[in-house]
A protein has these predicted regions:
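Glycine-rich, basic loop-to-helix element that forms the pyrophosphate-binding segment
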Residues: 28, 72-87
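Conserved donor nucleotide-binding strand/loop of the catalytic core
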Residues: 59-76
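Short, acidic, metal-binding catalytic loop of nucleotide-sugar glycosyltransferases
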Residues: 30-39
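Short aromatic/hydrophobic "clamp" motif used to bind/position activated sugar donors
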Residues: 93
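A conserved acidic beta->alpha catalytic loop
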Residues: 46-55
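A short, conserved alpha-helix in the catalytic core of glycosyltransferases
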Residues: 110-111, 173-178, 185-209
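Conserved donor-nucleotide/metal-binding helix-loop-beta segment in metal-dependent transferases, i.e.
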Residues: 105-125
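N-proximal low-complexity "stem/linker" segments adjacent to membrane-targeting elements
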Residues: 1-30
Length: 263
């Protein structure tokens, strides 16, 4: 049996953003419970879900003892993360969207990540999940690599130094990088924070086995709510080349010229 004390994180707030996927949220929270994984507090930030999900959220808040932060209408990802982060009271934030499920190994790696961020005042983020490996990595230890970036980095996907995918960060994140822009599509919101992270010289670690530590689940009855423009996913070779050239130019321009998210 797992030792409960080993999986207790009193200095970490679990922040979960939610929209119309209460079954997925319940699955996530049950998974942490099954792993004997507990936090200093749990914040669930809802983005104006349908009434049936709000009713379920209120039931779940009693079962799992979390602070439910709501809004009267859908305001987008930026507002949802901002108001959730504003409700956090602990020193560190584990940010996860509701459609993820941690593996049995997750608590021990979260413990490692917490140790790293506690002992390195310059470390801003530890990432646990991605669709593919960050292009610029150097060895840190057996399980983690250090992300790095410089002005001569030629890969356009260098901007994903930051990602909205599951990560541990300091709860003072906004002080260094600014708040998430509001009123925009989710992918644009994330993009602007990616740029801000680079502009403000963020520092982060990346979990090497990123596809297996925590998995994303989107059942048919609760599909992903993130929609991206079709041309960005077009398999046509010419379209891909045009897209890559466009991204290389735009991303580098934005790193240099985009207005800072910091007020």
């Amino acid at each position: 049996m797992n030792n409960l004390s080993l999986n207790t994180f009193p200095s970490i707030s679990l922040l979960v953003t939610h929209y119309n996927r209460s079954k997925s949220l319940e699955n996530l929270l049950n998974s942490f419970k099954d792993l004997n994984c507990s936090f200093g507090e749990i914040i669930v930030s809802d983005d104006g879900s349908e009434e049936k999900h709000i009713i379920k959220l209120k039931e779940l808040s009693q079962k799992f003892t979390f602070n439910l932060v709501t809004t009267v209408k859908n305001k987008g990802l930026g507002n949802n993360i901002n108001k959730g982060q504003d409700a956090v009271s602990k020193k560190y934030t584990l940010y996860i969207q509701e459609d993820f499920v941690p593996s049995p190994l997750f608590p021990s790696k979260l413990k490692d990540a917490l140790s790293f961020i506690e002992n390195d005042a310059e470390l801003d983020i530890v990432r646990f999940y991605a669709y593919y490996a960050y292009p610029y990595l150097r060895p840190f230890n057996e399980d983690f690599s250090e992300m790095y970036i410089d002005k001569f980095a030629s890969r356009y996907d260098k901007i994903y130094y930051y990602s909205d995918h599951p990560h541990l960060r300091r709860s003072s994140f906004f002080n260094k990088f600014g708040r998430y822009p509001e009123g925009l599509k989710g992918d644009i919101t994330e993009y602007k924070m990616c740029i801000s992270f680079i502009q403000n010289k963020g520092k982060g670690l990346f979990y090497n086995d990123f596809a297996n530590l925590i998995r994303q689940e989107n059942p048919e009855d609760e599909p992903s709510t993130m929609q991206r423009s079709n041309w960005k996913q077009n398999p046509n070779f010419v379209i891909r080349i045009m897209r890559d050239v466009y991204r290389q130019i735009k991303y580098n321009y934005d790193i240099l010229m985009m207005k800072s998210l910091k007020s």
